[in-house]
UniProtKB/Swiss-Prot annotation:
The organism of origin for this protein: Jasminum nudiflorum
Gene Ontology molecular function: any one: ATP binding
SUPFAM superfamilies per record: P-loop containing nucleoside triphosphate hydrolases (SSF52540)
InterPro entries: AAA+_ATPase (IPR003593), ATPase_AAA_core (IPR003959), P-loop_NTPase (IPR027417), Uncharacterised_Ycf2 (IPR008543), Ycf2_N (IPR056777)
Protein family membership: Belongs to the Ycf2 family.
Record's protein name: Protein Ycf2
Any one cellular-component term (Gene Ontology): chloroplast stroma
SMART domains attached to this UniProt entry: AAA
Length: 1974
């Protein structure tokens, strides 16, 4: 049955193999045939399309996209293509990159702009900028906000605007109320401040106009000018005025506020949910740019607090500050004097619609960071900042910080403070003082949360009757126009102050409200009244009333300053009563506004409530811990330092470690929005665009190394871009130029600077200058954009305006809707009259300076903001267009195009159908003549199916003719295959054509509506006069419409080109299909079949020469003849032509076609089929190997690298570069350096960089490619980094000179996961992976069956026959062999080069070897195995690049049978004959046994050690196993490490499976620590026998006693490292026989998981004795009968521990001292982990004797001769290996172990494993060959190997299975004395003969003396047992007994309680034990 199955499988495999060959032939013929030219061009085009498509995933990946923008990568790619031999490939790649890439980008940008402008709306047109900046949309007043927002289809791409429900409108208070307003709610994803518009109505009665508009009905175009004016959406002329709108009723206002307060609403932001934008106020008008001399050195500062009166929690002051930032104008502060431009006078400041205070302190921003953090520290930890009981000195905080952190001599020492305040109001300084006082108090109150909050709330004593108390500042104005500026300040009335307010009858309010005498009666002025005089009195009285512990010290220092610098210092002590001390009033005025404004940042997060500043939680600690970081966040307002330091640094740092930058997820700046969940690896470069100025609208993002998304302290310079329509204020050109110069890396020239100023800071347009001042201000506020942004319509934009007198006529004509032809004629006429358009009218005017703009904007595109913007531009539109492009053909074809196309295709199909009607079935003909649009695909599929049916019939009929007809069958299949491919190509092109036509229809619809609107606009403009403004909406007059029209025109032209191309291809596809059908016709003619059969019989096609494949049997000569051309052409062509003259042309064509195909087949066998031919025709492969190789054929086919994988490898970020990473579970994972090196090595091998040769003069190539090697070769130098020394003069060299290892030896103990690591790397590398199993070479049962020697040897005789055949063939074809050798093959060149091969000598050698093989069949077996091994090596060479893995490589030299294979491996892998693209990874757990020849320089020259998992790695592994199964772990912090200590990866899996079973049985999805403890207990205890419930309370009390002692004595040291849970389950065999009695106890799995440095040995002694004492106290009658360690094995353990204690007391030294550190054989000394070993003997005498012994040994070796083998060659067998290290064997280093241990049942399971490399003594009578097991049981071990453990400074005590015996038998020997169990005579049994497993390492002459040394050393290491020690033992035992006795008697109730719980629950966990002791 098996043989039949194998035969059937072999037949199937052969058929599959042949079919694969035929398929390859078909594809080759498709490529080479001349009539498939168009088909080949189609595939070429399709390949190019795939290349372009491969770029699309790069756009979705930020790191790859940013790296792709580096021109160095493009230079590398182009250089690689230039160096290629195929010129066409280089041209194709360049064409794809240049042409199609540009087309893709342009089309994507245009589609984005068209789609996101919301063009196709009902009779309206909205314009959107490239960036999602909210514009002024015009709409009627009575439209609801939701309808306005809903009308736009790009809300998800623009800045999200929260909208109202239907029927509700926007109210004034919804924007002014921070509680109600959504813009101030930090829970929302986006805050947007609406664009305000000035009105002459009172400020309290206005509402925010023109925030979001609604589409205008077309009826508005026909309405009156009054209607248009009523909605304030047009600008008629210079005398136009804004009309006021009606107030919204109060009830509706309240509804809107309630709606806006709803925190559940959220709208997606443009930058996804990770980002948030904050758009702040507007910018001053043109007057700020005219005269900038008066206040050139001053800064603009403004703030307006706002608050709802109903709120009682001061934490909402955050919203107040947020609202202030939205409504104020924050001008950047520069450290360079003269760089800032501020408004000249107050009227200019009025234009900003905000209150502006001027205060100049150029260095205040540098001081803020230190002051803020010092201020934070003074509040949270005052004892660390100031001495106890001391007051604040008169020196500023900044001075103290300078002394502490900043070196002396800083330029800040010469700081001179200047204060210039220019206001007409006399009391404005008092207003400033009062505001700052209130603001600072608010900040203090918010920062200290509940402690100061209840106190400082009561400072604001106001009139309680005024619920919404308002006060404002009225500023006088200079110049024309009056703009009323008011701000609201709402403070609550503290209800708790009512009593205090009534008591103080003459109470003077701190703030006195008085009406301003200014022109605006609605403005209030506030000033300090007399209340300021007694402020300190009231404050102290109030605080004394409240018994506060607050101290607020307001001091001033007077040194080094001309004017006093006021500071605000406050300190809160954790303990003690402090007094309010207010020395002066003016110190409330802080030094600068930024300090007080940003003090709140230090206390923003909840983490700052705590006393400690952790690095992961506190921003404060990060600043001072990383002060030297090159991205220094301490300088918050140096807006260029951050970017300049980044770009001035080594840029390769970002390539090597791209994750150095990340974001802050915790909100820190007052107006940041959300806490985004951002991991460290989400982004590449961080956020370098911190503050983006859109006029004065700012959103702030931060850069840093921590995990938070935002940090308000870090601000950098804005990088503006014309593409993103970011406007730089007029007062910023110098700073902007400086920033861009830093970013670009090269300074800008003067011409570029001038161009930059002209580009970014253009003056206002002519229309703005001509308007009056008030109109100009209103215009600026209305539009909120400068005209240089191409969004403000100016006179240049409307040169066709008519005079005012033609206004009425234009209105009349406007009422008539002009027809489209009339509009077109008018536009053309006007275009002729105009001649040429102004340069500003061009939509692409910036293209003229594209070079300068590209250089300027390129850094911005490399930032994350730029990437997000480009990502949204080029990728988001495709998702919108996808439904449109996939619609049906009938809905998109225009009438004309569809008719013409249908007619042409129908004619083609009809002609094709008529030509095929004679040869094919009627069903095929009828199907092809059906309709094109409905059944084209079905017709072609039916034709293919009918043709296949015909092939089946033809195959059946021709089966009896002969094998030659198979060629005709394959040819027919080839034609049908061509037909199917053409059908597929046609269908694909037709689908693409449908999509393009659909797209054209969509564009046509847009262009039609847009063209109509545009022509309407043009015609209307021609009708109106020059001085008359037409009644057309503003948005219809923008020049962006022209840009849209040009874009549509471009897209239409592109669509036409695509349609033309596809139509041409479709027509050619039809013609090729027709040709293919014609070629099928001759196969149906019987006469042609007969003629062809006759021709094939006379002239058969040539067959491959079998001589080639017979030579494969030779090991050396297999590869020589792969490239032999075996094509034998017909020699007599004239005779052939004469004999073929009577044949028909069809038969000749078929014969020619068949011969051509056969020639191509044999020719290409040497190219990509030599492996196939070799495997198929070779006799060396048995049947199993043959099918195995056929199955793995896919790995043998080598492919060339194309542009896609190279580009992917260059731009792909290897996340393995970070040695320290965070996994999903939050556990820190430290990867071993050896594994990191191996990962990088495989990664470089995968990226084809192994042998990449380049010229060192190319800096880009050098840096990019050597960046990989810099990370993997860092261990070669002592400092940990590799310094490359490149050859000079630009000579090319190979990267192999930089020592990437070609062979790696991975060592590690069993269970460390060596094989898992290698297989994982091989899987991720996507390279062929070959496993050379050495174990198969050691197998005694080979794959072929050997027969007995006296019988015949058929297999051997067969080999001899092949050898004889080889000898005969070689003698005949000597010259032929030498001439046909391929020079590229790696063969023995010396033999071939001589040319005089002695074939007679070769024959004699073969004959001699044959005779020897007959005599020694084992040799034949070994040779056969070596040949198999060599075949694998040859296969690796063929399919290289690949990875070879050789597990257990130490077995190559252990036996004679592997010596030949080892030699072959060394020879093949030598430097001379090995290939360069093979990575060999060998692994072993016994590195001492590896052959030294394998680890030479050119072979396995790199050694990597794999250690056991660290606890974080185990946790990650466990968490992964649990999460993948749907369970959630909930483990204690330290308990997991104690539970799984010593477990390997293989052990964790069954442990987790058991835990899951327990969780399922308990019906819980959360796996906690106790569940894993139960699983571990079940796994370890129930491994040997089934559990049984034990009713014996004696054993239970034994366990309880031990647990109580551990909890009482060791709880402080063990923490969570407690014992395994108590269980009442016992071993079944404990009560089975009854003879043993209570011989087995519960396994004490984790007895003492702690450090010896924390717990003394005495605690261990107490723990060992606890069980016995507790049992005896509870069950033995009478206290006089209590005996310690009676008949228990505890006595032995106790005894050994007591010996250690005595030894330590004698030496008076620490127990273990400093442990030695492992010397890793790898080169990662810098990253090694301390690995404690067995300590040396502690007795000084023993150490001294050991040294003398060593000297004597060396002396004896020097005298003696004839050593057979060195001692290091001794080896031992492994019997068993422990999972947990047993510490007492380490501590009892040299103590002899008694034989009675084994007799008592003590399992010596650690012992045999530890004897590797050690001497093994055995009796004389034992024989190794007889019984190895008996031999292993007969010897006595004398030494132990090093037993390392897996956690530093901790060890685990794991007494193995059953440890404590409760039998009644007497213990042999005295407990209190230690007798000598070994006499000298016992050791002398080995004196006569000493044997080891293999060979003796002692010389015959030196045995006697060395045995004496061994015996003496055993004596030295034995402890002395005298009477003094016995007395000490007895004393310690009695003291221990008394202590434990008193302990248990005092806790008898606890013992009983534990017993009851244990009987009831059957489990007692450590945490439950903790409850008992509480």
């Amino acid at each position: 049955m098996n043989e039949d199955t194998n035969k059937e499988r072999g037949t199937i495999g052969t058929v599959q193999w042949r079919w694969g060959e035929r398929l390859g032939e078909i594809l080759r013929e498709i490529k080479n045939s001349h009539y498939f030219f168009f088909f080949d061009s189609f595939f070429d085009s399709w390949t190019q399309f795939n290349s372009v498509r491969s770029f699309i995933p790069i756009f979705f990946h930020q790191e790859r996209f940013l790296k792709l923008a580096d021109p160095r990568i493009w230079s590398i790619l182009l250089s690689r293509t230039q160096g290629s031999t195929q010129g066409s490939t280089s041209i194709t790649i360049k064409g794809v990159i240049l042409f199609k890439g540009v087309i893709l980008f342009v089309v994507a940008a245009l589609i984005y702009r068209i789609n996101n402008r919301n063009m196709v709306e009902s009779k309206t047109l909205y314009l959107r900028g490239l960036l999602p900046i909210p514009m002024n949309s015009i709409g009627p007043r009575n439209d609801t906000l939701e309808e306005s927002v809903g009308s736009s289809n790009i809300n998800r791409l623009i800045v999200s605007l929260l909208y109202l429900p239907k029927g509700k409108r926007i109210s004034e208070s919804s924007f002014l109320n921070p509680k109600e307003s959504t813009f101030l709610n930090p829970k929302e994803s986006t805050w947007v401040l609406p664009i305000t518009k000035k009105s002459s109505m009172p400020w309290g009665s206005r509402w925010w106009r023109n925030w979001i508009g609604k589409k205008r009905d077309s009826s508005q175009l026909k309405g009156s000018s009054y209607q248009s004016r009523d909605h304030l959406d047009s600008i008629s002329n210079e005398d136009s005025e804004y009309h006021n709108q009606r107030e919204i009723p109060l009830p509706e206002e309240r509804k809107i506020e309630e709606f806006l307060e709803n925190p559940t609403r959220s709208v997606r932001s443009f930058f996804s949910d990770r980002w948030s934008e904050l758009h702040l106020g507007s910018n001053p008008t043109e007057r700020s740019t005219r005269d900038q001399k008066l206040l050139k050195k001053q800064q603009d500062l403004s703030f307006v607090p706002s608050r709802r009166s109903e709120k009682k929690e001061m934490v909402h002051i955050f919203k107040i500050i947020t609202y202030l930032q939205n409504t104020v104008s924050i001008h950047p502060i520069s450290s360079d004097p003269g760089c800032d431009r501020v408004p000249k006078d107050e009227s200019d400041m009025d234009s900003s619609n905000k209150i502006s205070f001027l205060n100049k302190n150029p260095f205040s921003e540098e001081r803020f960071q230190e002051m803020a953090n010092r201020f934070t520290l003074s509040i949270t930890e005052p004892d660390l900042v100031y001495p106890k009981g001391s007051r604040f000195c008169n020196e500023s905080i900044y001075r103290r910080i300078i002394k502490k952190w900043v070196p002396r001599g800083n330029v800040l020492e010469n700081l001179k403070r200047t204060q210039i305040v220019v206001f007409v109001s006399n009391n404005i300084m008092e207003a400033v003082n009062q505001y700052r006082l209130i603001r600072n108090l608010i900040q203090i109150q918010y920062s200290t949360y509940g402690y100061i909050r209840n106190v400082l709330n009561r400072f604001f004593l106001m009139n309680r009757s005024d619920r919404n108390f308002e006060y404002g500042i009225q500023r006088d104005q200079i110049g024309k126009g009056t703009l009323n500026h008011r701000t609201l300040m709402k403070y609550m009335i503290n209800q708790h102050l009512s009593n205090f307010f009534l008591k103080k009858s003459p109470f003077d309010s701190l703030i006195v409200i008085e009406k301003s005498k200014n022109r605006d009666p609605f403005a209030y002025r506030y000033k300090w009244s007399n209340g300021s005089k007694n402020f300190q009195e009231h404050l102290e009285h109030f605080l004394s009333e409240q018994k506060s512990r607050l101290e607020i010290a307001f001091d001033q220092f007077q040194r080094n300053y001309d004017k006093p610098l006021p500071l605000l210092l406050e300190s809160i002590a954790s303990i003690g009563l402090q007094i309010v001390h207010l020395k002066k009033w003016k110190p409330f005025l802080l030094d600068d506004h930024d300090t007080s404004r940003k003090m709140i940042d230090s206390f923003h997060t909840r983490n700052n409530r705590r006393k400690s500043f952790e690095k992961t939680d506190s921003y404060f600690s990060m600043i001072f811990d990383n002060q030297d970081n090159w991205l220094n966040p301490v300088k918050p307002f140096h807006r260029s330092s951050l970017i300049s330091s980044f770009f001035k640094a080594n840029r390769l740092r970002f390539w090597n470690n791209p994750h150095h930058f990340c974001f802050y997820s915790n909100t820190r700046f007052p107006f940041s929005v959300e806490k985004a969940r951002i991991s460290n690896y989400d982004f590449t470069y961080g956020q370098f665009l911190n503050i983006l100025f859109i006029r004065n609208k700012i959103f702030s993002l931060c850069v840093g190394k921590k995990k938070h998304a935002f940090g308000g302290r870090d601000t950098i310079s804005p990088i503006e871009s014309q593409v993103s329509n970011i406007f730089i204020p007029n007062y910023f050109p110098s700073r902007t130029i400086y920033s861009i110069a830093d970013i670009s890396g090269t300074p800008l020239t003067e011409e570029e600077i001038v161009n930059l100023e002209r580009t970014y800071c253009q003056p206002l347009s002519v229309s703005d200058r001509n308007l009056s001042d008030s109109e100009g201000k209103n215009l600026n506020q209305y539009l909120n954009f400068n005209s240089s942004m191409r969004l403000i319509p100016t006179e240049k934009d409307f040169p066709w305006k008519k005079p005012e007198k033609r206004k009425k006529r234009s209105q009349k004509r406007k009422k008539q809707s002009p027809c489209l032809p009339c509009l077109l004629c008018l536009c053309l006429k006007k275009g002729v009259e105009k001649g040429e358009m102004d340069r500003r009218d061009s939509a692409f005017s910036f293209l003229s300076d594209w070079k300068d703009l590209f250089q300027t904007y390129m850094p911005w595109f490399l930032t994350s903001t730029g990437y997000k913007h480009l990502n949204g531009i080029f990728l988001e539109p495709f998702s919108d267009l996808l439904p449109i492009l996939t619609s049906s053909l009938s809905s998109c074809l225009s009438s004309s195009l569809s008719s013409s196309l249908s007619s042409s295709l129908s004619s083609s199909l009809s002609s094709l159908s008529s030509s095929l009607s004679s040869s094919l079935s009627s069903s095929l003909s009828s199907s092809l003549s059906s309709s094109l649009s409905s059944s084209l695909s079905s017709s072609l599929s039916s034709s293919l199916s009918s043709s296949l049916k015909f092939v089946s019939t033809f195959h059946d009929s021709m089966h009896e003719v002969g094998i030659s007809w198979q060629i005709l069958q394959i040819e027919l299949q080839l034609r049908l295959f061509h037909l199917s491919h053409w059908k597929w190509a046609f269908q694909f092109q037709w689908d693409r054509l449908n999509k393009i036509l659909n797209w054209i229809n969509w564009i046509s619809e847009i262009s039609r509506k847009c063209m109509y609107s545009r022509l309407l606009l043009e015609a209307t403009g021609m009708i109106h006069g020059k001085n008359e403004s037409p009644l057309i909406p503003t948005h219809l007059r923008s020049v962006n419409v022209r840009e849209l029209l040009y874009s549509i025109l471009f897209l239409l032209l592109l669509a036409g080109y695509l349609v033309h191309t596809h139509l041409v291809f479709v027509s050619r596809a039809f013609s090729e299909l027709q040709t293919e059908f014609k070629k099928l016709k001759p196969f149906l003619i019987p006469s042609s079949r007969m003629e062809l059969e006759e021709l094939l019989d006379a002239y058969p096609t040539s067959e491959p020469n079998p001589f080639e494949f017979e030579l494969v049997k030779s090991i050396r000569s297999k590869k020589k003849y792969w490239n032999i051309n075996l094509i034998d052409f017909i020699p007599h062509r004239i005779t052939l032509s004469r004999k073929m003259s009577h044949l028909s042309h069809t038969s000749k064509e078929l014969y020619s076609l068949i011969r051509k195909r056969e020639n191509v087949n044999i020719k290409n066998a040497n190219e990509d089929g030599k492996i196939d031919s070799w495997v198929v025709n070779s006799d060396l492969f048995v049947e199993e190997e043959f099918f195995h190789l056929l199955y793995d054929r896919t790995f043998m086919l080598t492919t060339k690298k194309s542009i896609d994988p190279i580009l992917w490898s260059l731009t792909h970020s290897d996340h393995l570069s970070t040695h320290l990473s965070k996994n999903d579970s939050g556990y820190q994972m430290i990867e071993q350096p050896g594994a990191i090196y191996l990962r990088y090595l495989v990664d470089i091998h995968k990226k084809s960089l192994w042998n990449y040769e380049f010229n060192t003069s190319c800096l880009a190539e050098k840096r990019v490619f050597l960046a990989h090697y810099q990370t993997i070769t860092y261990s070669q130098t002592s400092c940990g980094t590799n310094t490359f020394h490149f050859p000079s003069h630009g000579k090319p060299f190979s990267l192999r000179l930089l020592s990437p290892s070609r062979g790696v030896l991975v060592i590690g103990s069993i269970g460390t996961g060596r094989s898992y690591l290698v297989k994982h790397l091989a899987t991720n590398s996507h390279l062929p992976f070959i496993r050379l199993a050495v174990s198969e070479l050691l197998n005694n049962n080979p794959k072929f069956r050997w027969i007995e020697p006296e019988d015949s040897w058929p297999v051997f005789d067969d080999l001899l026959e092949h050898s004889a055949y080889y000898e005969n063939r070689v003698g005949d074809g000597r010259d032929y062999i030498i001439d046909t050798i391929d020079a590229s093959d790696d063969i023995d060149i010396d033999i071939v080069a001589r040319g005089d091969i002695d074939f007679d000598k070769e024959e004699e050698l073969l004959t001699r070897e044959s005779d020897e093989e007959k005599k020694n069949p084992v040799r034949v077996q070994e040779k056969y195995r070596a040949e198999q091994f060599e075949e694998d090596l040859e296969l690796a060479k063929i399919i290289s690049p690949c990875i070879i893995w050789i597990p257990n490589i130490h077995d190559l030299n252990l036996r004679e049978s592997t010596s030949l294979a080892a030699g072959l491996f060394v020879n093949k892998y030598s430097e001379r004959c090995s290939t360069r693209d093979i990575l060999v990874i060998a692994s072993t757990h016994i590195p001492q046994k590896v052959d030294p020849s394998l680890i030479s320089t050119n072979r396995l020259n790199r050694c990597i050690k794999v250690r056991r998992f660290f606890i974080p790695q185990k946790e990650k592994h466990v968490f992964t196993l649990l999460y993948t199964r749907g369970f959630h772990p909930h483990l204690e912090k330290n308990a997991f490490g104690s539970i799984t200590l010593g477990s390997s990866a293989q052990d964790l899996r069954p442990l987790i499976n058991d835990a899951l079973l327990i969780g399922i049985s308990q019906r819980k999805s959360i796996i906690d620590t106790n569940t894993i403890r139960c699983a571990l207990h079940r796994e370890t205890w129930e491994f040997q026998s089934h559990p049984k419930w034990v009713p014996n309370s004696q054993i239970l009390f034994y366990q309880i006693g031990r647990a109580v002692v551990q909890k009482v004595l060791l709880s402080n040291c063990l923490s969570n490292y407690l014992i395994d849970p108590l269980s009442i389950y016992m071993k079944k065999r404990s009560f089975a026989g009854g003879t043993e009695g209570d011989s087995s106890l519960y396994k004490w799995y984790f007895e003492l998981g702690t450090s010896l440095k924390l717990v003394t040995i005495l605690l261990y002694l107490l723990s060992c004795s606890a069980g016995s004492v507790a049992r005896d106290l509870c069950f033995l009658p009478g206290e006089d009968r209590i005996k310690l360690f009676e008949n228990e094995m505890d006595s032995t353990l106790f005894h050994e521990l007591l010996l250690i204690l005595l030894e330590v007391l004698a030496l008076e030294s620490p127990l273990m001292g400093s442990s030695r550190t492992e010397k890793d054989c790898s080169q990662f000394d810098n990253d090694r982990v301390p690995f404690p070993f067995r300590p040396e003997p502690r007795k000084l005498l023993a150490i001294q004797r050991f040294l003398s012994e060593k000297e004597e040994w060396e002396l004896a070796e020097g005298k003696e001769e004839g050593l057979l083998q060195p001692p290091q060659e001794i080896e031992g067998h492994i019997v068993s290996a422990p999972k947990i290290w047993r510490p007492w064997f380490c501590l009892l280093d040299g103590l002899d172990r008694p034989v009675e241990f084994l007799e008592l049942g003590y399992p010596y399971c650690y012992g045999y494993r530890s004897f590797e490399g050690k001497q093994i003594l055995f009796d004389k009578e034992d024989e190794l060959e007889e019984n190895d097991s008996e031999f292993l049981q007969s010897f006595i071990p004398r030494s132990s190997d090093e037993h390392g453990f897996f956690k530093l400074n901790q060890f685990i005590w794991d007494p193995p299975d059953p440890l404590f015996l409760l039998s009644t038998d007497e213990f042999p020997g005295s407990v209190f004395s230690y007798r000598e169990l070994f006499a000298d005579e016992e050791l002398r049994i080995t004196k006569t003969k000493l044997r080891t497993f293999r060979t003796r390492w002692l010389s015959k002459k030196a045995q006697k003396g060395r045995l004496e040394l061994l015996i003496n050393r055993q004596r030295w290491l034995r402890p002395n047992s005298d009477e003094s020690e016995d007395s000490l033992y007895s004393q310690i035992l009695s003291e221990i007994f008394e202590y434990l006795k008193n302990l248990f008697l005092s806790k008898r109730g606890l013992l009983d309680q534990t017993r009851k719980v244990l009987f009831r629950k059957r489990w007692v966990f450590p945490d439950e034990m903790h409850i008992f002791f509480m």
